[in-house]
């Protein structure tokens, strides 16, 4: 096996102007949803604005990934509620943008170990979340129940689903456990505001063009500081491109897909060839 090899770059470009397709019917008059709409407009206004600004870098690509996997793009509102678009967010064992538990993340194909935590990668974690949400929707036949199940984790909501045929947009507050109803209401309230932020006094998002990179599969141990020196970029730039790396290093033989700044592959290959001879 070669020491390094090129791998295809992610094909999702995130440039679609239509991020919100309004596929989720929101029961907007539900008291609990209204409560959180008022909260985000008032006490939580600064938090909402800061989270949306932080999401400008990754939200377009996330929505494209969701749509490509058959999940409504608006489900990205989960990220707002779960992590405020903060990759290092962690709560009770859950981690990353989508706050997935390590076990669930691994089941969805993510790598989570001492060296790498792909829950912190906006592209890979969104693909895993889309797969998980799609599975939940296929089981419950409702995006509202899929939301509730996403939050419930191992706690069952199946009994609720069996007692009533839930259609998206129907009154749900009486059907879901209290904790799930609160969670779903937060997500739907955020979703509603994210559809028309200007209507509620928020600035129109200025979405950034998705970050480009040249991926290369590395099969030998490397430090990011070494690579940064080889290609003459700040190590912080490599950290930004490779958020899933926990220790700024690649485990030998792990086959890590290292992301390089565009145009730096040739420098990297020359330096790596020399490095491998030592």
Which residues does each PLM region occupy?
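Substrate-binding/active-site groove segments that recognize
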Residues: 93-115, 126-128, 133, 157-160, ...
């Amino acid at each position: 096996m070669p020491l390094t090899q090129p791998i295809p770059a992610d094909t999702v470009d995130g440039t679609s102007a239509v991020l919100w397709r309004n596929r989720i019917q929101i029961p907007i008059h539900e008291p609990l949803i209204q409560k959180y709409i008022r909260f985000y407009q008032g006490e939580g206004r600064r938090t909402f604005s800061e989270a949306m600004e932080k999401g400008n870098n990754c939200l377009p690509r996330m929505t494209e990934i969701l749509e490509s996997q058959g999940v409504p793009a608006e489900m990205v509102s989960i990220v707002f509620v779960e992590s405020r678009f903060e990759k290092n967010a962690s709560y009770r064992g859950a981690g990353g943008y989508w706050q997935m538990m390590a076990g669930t993340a691994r089941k969805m194909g993510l790598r989570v170990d001492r060296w790498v935590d792909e829950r912190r990668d906006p592209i890979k974690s969104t693909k895993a979340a889309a797969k998980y949400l799609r599975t939940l929707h296929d089981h419950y036949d409702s995006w509202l129940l899929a939301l509730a199940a996403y939050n419930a984790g191992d706690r069952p909501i199946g009994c609720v689903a069996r007692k009533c045929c839930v259609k998206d947009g129907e009154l749900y507050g009486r059907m879901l456990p209290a904790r799930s109803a609160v969670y779903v209401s937060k997500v739907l309230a955020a979703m509603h505001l994210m559809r028309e932020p200007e209507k509620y006094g928020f600035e129109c998002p200025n979405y950034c063009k998705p970050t480009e990179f040249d991926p290369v599969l590395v099969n030998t141990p490397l430090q990011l500081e070494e690579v940064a020196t080889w290609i003459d970029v700040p190590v912080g730039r490599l950290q930004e491109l490779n958020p899933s790396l926990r220790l700024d290093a690649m485990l030998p033989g792990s086959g890590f897909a290292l992301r390089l700044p565009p145009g730096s592959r040739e420098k990297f290959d020359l330096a790596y060839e020399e490095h491998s001879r030592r």
